Amino acid sequence: MQFIDYAEIEVEGGKGGDGIVAFRREKYVPAGGPAGGNGGWGGSVIFVANSNLQTLLDFRYARRFKADDGKRGGPNNCTGANGKDCLVEVPCGTMVYNLETEEILGDLVENGQTLCVAAGGKGGLGNKHFLSNQNRAPDYALPGLEGEHRWLRLELKLLAEVGIIGLPNAGKSTLMASLSAARPKIADYPFTTLVPNLGVVRKPTGDGTVFADIPGLIEGAHEGIGLGHEFLRHIERTRLLLHLVDITSPDPVKDYQIIQQELEAYGRGLSDRPQIIALNKMDAADEETFLLIKNELTHLSSSPIIGISGVSRTGLEDLLQIVWQLLDS
C-alpha cells in the first residue's frame, strides 16, 4: 500500500432546511392560526479516527466531502428531518488544520475519537414562530442557514514511542527487523527506506512498544531537502530517539553531528528529546575503533552510547534495557 501522509480536502456541512408558511385547516377551525414547521438541521462532516488505517491514501482520490441538507418543515408544526452526517474515517495520528488560517482544528490520536470539521446549518423557522398580538397570521418564514465550508490540510504523524533516526544506510531497517516483527525492505544502498515503518517490540512484561524506522535524513533535511520535513514530522510524537551511527563510515562523529544539527534546525524540541546513540555494524569493526569513537562522542553528548549490530544482534538486549529504563523514567 502506498504511504501518503499529507492531503488537502474540501468539506461542507449540509444546508439547514427551510421553514415553511402554513395555516391550520381543520374543518371546524375556520380561522386557523399559523402552523408552518421549522426546517431540519443540515448534516455535519465528522472525522472518525480508525486505528486500522495507516495512510491518507484515500484522500488522493476523494477530495470533497459534503453532508446532506436538512429537509424543509411541514404543515401542522412538523419539523423537517435533519440531514445525514457525513462520517469520514482517518488514521489515528491525523492532525487537522484550516488550510486558509493555519488554525489547528484537532489532533485525532485515539481510536474512535471524533472531530466535527464542518457543522451543518440551522433549520429556518416556520411562520408559527412569528405569531404575535400584532400579527395573528404571519405569512413569512425563514430559510435554513448554509453549512460550514472549509478547506483542510491533513497531516499524519505516526504514533510511536521510539523513533529510529540516522543517515541513509546507517542500518535502521535491519535493526527494526531484528527488534520486531516488522519486515521493512532492506538493501545495501542509501534510501532503501522511502516511507516510515512501524514495528512493535515486546517488553519482558509482554507489553508492546511501537518503534518507528524513519527514512534516512540528510544534510538540509530541516529545509525539506530529501523530503526531510515529511520525515522529521513523524518523530515529533516520539518520547525517545534511537540515533543510529554507522561505525564503518569514514567519519561517524560527523555523521552524528549532521543529524543533530538537523534536529536543532527543525525545532519543536526534537534536539532536546532523550536519545540513545547506537554505534551500529559492530560486526565489521573492532573494540579499539568503538572506544575511540565513543570517547569523541562523549564530548558532544551526555546520551548513553552503545555498540550494536543489527545483523549479528550483538548488543541488542543491552540496547533494549536502556530503552525500557529511559521510557520508564
Curated annotation (Swiss-Prot):
Its EC number is 3.6.5.-. Residues 160-328 form the OBG-type G domain. The keyword Cytoplasm applies. Its cofactor is Mg(2+). GO terms for molecular function: GTP binding; GTPase activity; magnesium ion binding. InterPro entries: G_OBG, GTP-bd, GTP-bd_Obg/CgtA, GTP1-OBG_CS, GTP1_OBG_dom, GTP1_OBG_dom_sf, OBG_GTPase, P-loop_NTPase. Residues 1-159 form the Obg domain. It is found in: Cytoplasm. Monomer. Belongs to the TRAFAC class OBG-HflX-like GTPase superfamily. OBG GTPase family. This is GTPase Obg. It comes from Rippkaea orientalis (strain PCC 8801 / RF-1).
